[in-house]
Amino acid sequence: MASQSKNSGLTNKVTTVVATNAFGADVMSEISYTDAKVVGNGSFGVVFQAKMVPSNEMVAIKKVLQDRRFKNRELQIMRKLRHDNIITLKWFFFSSGEKRDEVYLNLVMEFLPETLYKVERQYARAKQTLPVNFVRLYMYQLLRSMGYLHSLGFCHRDIKPQNMLLDSETGVLKLCDFGSAKQLISGEPNVSYICSRYYRAPELIFGSTDYTTKIDMWSAGCVMSELLLGQLIFPGDSGVDQIVEIVKVMGTPTSEQLHDMNPHYKQFKLPELKPHPWSKVFRIRTPAEAIDLVSKMLIYSPNARVSPLMGCAHPFFDELRQDPHQQLPNGRSLPPLFNFTDYEKTIEPDTMPLLLPRAQGSSTTKEPSAAHRNRNTAGEESPRKTEDSQKPATAALSKSPGPSGKALESPPGFLQHDLGNGDHVAVGTMPMEPLTLEQNHFAAESYAVGEDAEDNLEEDVGDENDYDYDDGGQCNSTYISDDMDEASESDDDDFEEEDEN
């Protein structure tokens, strides 16, 4: 149904359209919004921020060119998704374009003001990294959303910080932009030229067309590494250079690993490199559990990668479980993290007991074994670290002033247990108290990063060249990479044929 505009007599124009409810039966009703402004432009559409009338609720409206002969896959998938950590589609409607027979699909979604990428870039400008407790909070919610998504057979295929919306007031993270998502069916081929380059799983680079949802786990590992490092872990300049960057860190894949990634791969010459110990990839103060979790996601063999919910059960997230009554800096409680639905409890029932909160004071945190801590990125045993080997391969680690010019200090609740391996160091001198997240993103312990860290993060924008945006937030619902356009068009991936009846 085409949109209709009505002038309400107010200063700002109110647009009224006939829209369809996103969930349940196709019930159509009039909705009205005002104060629409463009917050993002992408290869396949424009995103507006608007205010609903009369509720004043803020929404994001993603407008994409639609071919009426096809069903838009993004719409079909979003209508099936209901999860606390996935952006909610509220309504959809069609509108006419300037050209004859030009029709646009408009997706009306909930609005969140920030993205993980935007927050990450703020830290990079201040030569800081995101405090580890925010890494913990945000990565948990990302993995939980992926566990739900994958259980339905859907693969996101474009996991990256730009597609993770944040509300700093509530601490909520929501996965967005399902323009590249697809239901993967065993035996049916899919294009390999998908996913933004820096987060693209190696099996995709090696041309696999029968990949699984484990490509999303690789992307999540890249995101977590980026948050810990303050810069991209694999900053490839091209598709081929991307695998070179991966090999530099993880070593040359074995013939068995190549077969696991793509049984039909025709081998070309790769540089013969040995893998680095994970402890040398990250900074000395990076928590051992964080490094261990990354090592379980960034694995060449797709089936060896941890599942999303097993990732949520990892000891890195035990601090969330040990005290579920922690508070955000504004005094609010943490967002719901353990309100698993009856459906979620059936996804991996054996894992569920590991996901639930533990009694405060219980000693359930598992320290990664010494043997595992000393494995390299290929999972092989590495020599014990010497004093010299404890120096990080990346920029030197030090406390550094925040934007206000004052040294950043950690609240008492952010004391870290010294695991005795050089990766965890005690911060502060106060007794341990219930963990309280910092006053704001810049008020917590944060580590200095290299001078080029922001440029490294910026490359993800400039290189892809896929959007223009106002740093206002929800534009990220249309972050679709030009790096993927060709593949999307050739895949039959973005649309499904409309039923004739």
From Swiss-Prot:
One of its GO terms (biological process) is male gamete generation. GO terms for cellular component: cytoplasm. Residues 451-471, 482-501 have a biased composition (Acidic residues). The active site is at D158 (proton acceptor). Residues 381-390 have a biased composition (Basic and acidic residues). SMART domains: S_TKc. One of its GO terms (molecular function) is protein serine/threonine kinase activity. Its EC number is 2.7.11.26. Residues 33-317 form the Protein kinase domain. The keyword ATP-binding applies. It holds the Pfam family Pkinase. It comes from the Eukaryota. It catalyses: L-seryl-[tau protein] + ATP = O-phospho-L-seryl-[tau protein] + ADP + H(+); L-threonyl-[tau protein] + ATP = O-phospho-L-threonyl-[tau protein] + ADP + H(+). ATP binds at V39, G40, N41, G42, S43, F44, G45, V46, V47, K62. The modification Phosphotyrosine is found at Y193. Phosphorylation on Tyr-193 is necessary for the activity. Belongs to the protein kinase superfamily. CMGC Ser/Thr protein kinase family. GSK-3 subfamily. PANTHER family: GLYCOGEN SYNTHASE KINASE-3 ALPHA, PROTEIN KINASE SHAGGY-RELATED. This is Putative glycogen synthase kinase-3 homolog.
